From Swiss-Prot:
Gene3D superfamilies: Transferase(Phosphotransferase) domain 1. Its EC number is 2.7.11.1. Its main location: cytoplasm. It is found in: Cytoplasm. GO terms for molecular function: ATP binding; calmodulin binding; protein kinase activity; protein serine kinase activity; protein serine/threonine kinase activity. One of its GO terms (biological process) is osmosensory signaling pathway. Belongs to the protein kinase superfamily. CAMK Ser/Thr protein kinase family. CaMK subfamily. The active site is at D313 (proton acceptor). It comes from Saccharomyces cerevisiae (strain ATCC 204508 / S288c) (Baker's yeast). ATP binds at I169, G170, E171, G172, A173, F174, S175, K176, V177, K201. This is Serine/threonine-protein kinase RCK2.
């Protein structure tokens, strides 16, 4: 059993400390649908827009040449796993719908469209206009991207059609993720016009066949009807294609290719990276920035639920974002629990645009998603720590599971650490089953009653009493902004709290982020607090023969990655650092670990789904 040691100072030992982090900005992290990433140069993969419910760019979900998917999805109709319950299946009707989704006309939304939100002041609109202008000016930086030279020759390039692999940006247990650009000779004008760069997840068939063969050996003598790895890949592709069509808060599905040796899943490339990394960098989010992120997540979930699809693995690692220009605060607002020497400035927040460098936010990773329609589903999945009580207790559950996940993400953004934590997995799952969390002092002392109420409604133990997606979107707290002048308050007072920077285009690389921050001991421990527990839980389910359905393949992979090359428990314990809820920073703790020469930190487990 993997363990994470914890020390707690004067506070309940319920929560992992992710407050008071040293804030070194990091370089262009890029991620596609969940993966470990290497530094890549900042690029623009899609037009950047202000975020609004109505005036939002509708990213194209399907390229014009749909012949790659046609034969595969036709075949999928007859290859859906027979062992799944009716709720597991993607019906013939739905698969046909997937293949016929038209490409979205990106010209329907103009480049300079501004927010029509009545909550936004004239000053905010003016600033929003300036930011959009800056973004448009910067877009020319990518004009010569097709001339980029790959950093090396990749074996995966040989069978890939229409794209040029530039560099590897991530790697999972059975896949690699590449940044790529459309080939110069591509006949697909829609693709080359609307996507300067893409992310391609490459899955090697031989690796999947090997892991499925191992499972068959384990299940020998049992009535096993596990679907083939190919079926599982096609299911994930079909669901991703379905849910991303027409929703700008979901990472766009672009293309899919199958060759003799590989599966290629081509999808939108977001240059900001994971929201998880921003929580680590900023320690926590202001209520305004938390609203900005969580509302976009809620809109993505609303779209999925309207299609009868439940995500089942909502967490900060599965939220990606497009960066915006950072505007420094003249007098950063600090909480009493903050250390002014280490708390990073979140900067000015602009309603409808964002803040802290975070603009448009999108939901990724559909490896555990399931189409349930109006029926309940009973396949335990997700990440322990963000998993709803009814899932932990192996009860029937439906779309309210995603609302629990939204609540955990909101809690984490507001204070910097998750609502449920314990060094022992069995204790953690018991806490989740009982809904045992607290608004821990002093971190929650200055968070508004409205925010606490929203979290409480989302983390309601009884699913029937828990917010549904429409109730959450109507919550009063979600539909206000602290940065806007209150009634009778001068707008000049608010405008004077920050100063805007107008950097040269080449300085529009935002924060020059330091990727090492994401591999610091505290960040690793935060991920492992959820991912390791989830992997252990799924291992137990696998022994009982209860796993299956759409998420099976993803579960195999995450389990493999979480153990980081099958290190022994003893070695893992030596590499882990001690969590503490004091004011020490991530980098200070990391320095102590290095000075003690306890060995390298555990690599962050890959969250990409294969």
């Amino acid at each position: 059993m993997l363990k994470i040691k914890a020390l707690f100072s004067k506070k309940k030992p319920d929560q992992a400390d992710l407050s008071q982090e040293s804030k070194k900005p990091f370089k262009g992290k890029t991620r596609s649908s969940g993966t470990n990433n290497k530094d890549v140069s900042q690029i623009t993969s899609s037009p950047k827009k202000s975020f609004q419910d109505k005036n939002i760019v509708q990213y194209p979900s399907v390229v014009a040449d749909d012949h790659h998917m046609k034969s595969l999805t036709d075949e999928l109709v007859t290859t859906i796993d027979s062992d799944s319950s009716p709720s597991d299946n993607i019906t013939t009707e739905n698969v046909e719908t997937v293949t016929s989704v038209p490409a979205i006309d990106v010209h329907e939304s103009s480049e300079g469209q501004l927010s029509s939100d009545p909550l936004i002041s004239d000053e905010s609109l003016s600033e929003q206009s300036e930011i959009i202008s800056d973004i448009q000016d910067d877009s020319t930086d990518d004009d010569n991207m097709e001339d980029e030279i790959p950093e090396k020759s990749f074996l995966e390039q040989k069978e890939l059609i229409g794209y040029k692999l530039i560099n590897k940006i991530g790697e999972g247990a059975f896949s690699k993720v590449f940044r790529a650009i459309p080939a110069k000779n591509s006949s697909n004008e829609f693709l080359t016009k609307n996507y300067k760069a893409v992310a391609i997840k490459v899955i090697k068939k031989a690796d999947l066949s090997s892991i499925n063969g191992d499972h068959r050996k384990k299940d020998k003598g049992k009535d096993s009807t596990k679907t083939s790895s190919r079926d599982q890949v096609l299911k994930e592709v079909a669901l991703h294609k379905t849910v991303s069509a027409g929703c700008s808060q979901i990472v766009a599905f672009i293309d899919f290719q199958e060759t003799d040796s590989y599966y290629y899943i081509i999808q939108e490339l977001l240059t900001g990276g994971e929201i998880f990394g921003e929580i680590v960098r900023l320690t926590y989010f202001s209520e305004d920035l938390s609203r900005h992120v969580i509302k976009q997540l809620a809109l993505a979930v609303k779209h999925m639920h309207s299609l009868g699809v439940v995500h089942r693995d909502i967490k900060p690692e599965n939220l990606l974002f497009e960066p915006i220009e950072f505007t420094r605060s003249i007098k950063p607002k600090l909480r009493k629990s903050d250390d002014p020497q280490t708390k990073a400035d979140e900067g000015i927040f602009t309603p409808g645009v964002g803040g802290g460098g975070i603009g448009i936010v999108k939901l990724a990773d559909f490896g555990l998603s399931k189409q349930i329609f109006s029926k309940n589903t009973k396949t335990p999945c997700g990440t322990v720590g963000y998993t709803a009580p009814e899932v932990v207790k192996d009860e029937h559950y439906s779309m309210k599971v995603d609302m629990w996940g939204i609540g955990c993400v909101l809690y984490t953004m507001l204070c910097g650490f998750p609502p449920f934590y314990d060094e022992k997995i069995d204790t953690l799952t018991e806490k989740i089953s009982r809904g045992e969390y607290t608004f821990l002092k002093p971190w929650w002392d200055e968070i508004s009653a409205g925010a606490k109420n929203a979290v409480a409604k989302l983390l309601e133990l009884e699913p029937s009493k828990r917010y549904d997606i429409d109730q959450f979107l109507d919550d009063p707290w979600l539909n206000t902004f602290d940065c806007l002048p209150k009634e009778g308050e001068s707008s000049q007072k608010k405008a004077g709290t920050s100063e805007r920077r107008h950097p040269h285009k080449k300085q529009f690389q935002l924060f020059q982020r330091d990727s090492s921050l994401l591999f610091s001991p505290a960040a690793v421990a935060m991920r492992d607090a959820f991912d390791i527990g989830n992997a252990v839980k799924r291992t137990e389910e696998d022994r009982m023969g209860t796993r299956g359905g759409l998420g099976s393949l993803a579960e195999d992979e995450e389990l493999e990655d979480s153990y980081s090359g099958a290190q022994g428990d003893e070695q893992l314990e030596q590499n882990m650092f001690q969590l503490t809820l004091d004011t020490s920073t991530i980098l200070q703790r990391r320095k102590k670990v290095q000075e003690n020469d306890v060995g390298p930190t555990i690599p962050i487990s890959a969250t990409i789904r294969e």
